[in-house]
Swiss-Prot record:
GO terms for biological process: D-allose catabolic process; galactose catabolic process; lactose catabolic process via tagatose-6-phosphate; pentose-phosphate shunt, non-oxidative branch. SUPFAM superfamilies: Ribose/Galactose isomerase RpiB/AlsB (SSF89623). The keyword Isomerase applies. Coiled coil: none annotated. Keywords: Isomerase, Lactose metabolism. GO terms for molecular function: galactose-6-phosphate isomerase activity; ribose-5-phosphate isomerase activity. It catalyses: aldehydo-D-galactose 6-phosphate = keto-D-tagatose 6-phosphate. This is Galactose-6-phosphate isomerase subunit LacB 1.
Amino acid sequence: MKIAIGCDHIVTNEKMAVSDFLKSKGYDVIDCGTYDHTRTHYPIFGKKVGEAVVNGQADLGVCICGTGVGINNAVNKVPGIRSALVRDMTTALYAKEELNANVIGFGGKITGELLMCDIIDAFIKAEYKETEENKKLIAKIAHLESHHANQEDPDFFTEFLEKWDRGEYHD
């Protein structure tokens, strides 16, 4: 199984620890970045993880930023992604079993590294429980998606990266 993983600069260490854990369990890890502590913007890496999953490069995805809120919102904008921001086992299992989540999001400064690893392991092993109700709910959620052509523009995030470079965002 292939797992795509991405983060922002604030939680690079946490992402690397999760990546090492996944590799130790025998999973192939697609590291979508970031790779160091150079200041960057989390939507870039949420988008990369989401695209890896919907394009079939990865079976599932993991997104981590400081609180998890930003990167999880970003990855959920990729059509076909169903991501849940979780901090506990119950929420993660519900997301996979009932909503067929294909990405899981974390706040790397909120949820401890060992707990994240335990939750991710359980999430990967959990099975979607297909029911008519679940299928209808997922179809309704998918119906809300819309594709915006400008997202394919390689300069889509340039405006925000320039603001980062000018120091207009805080960590």
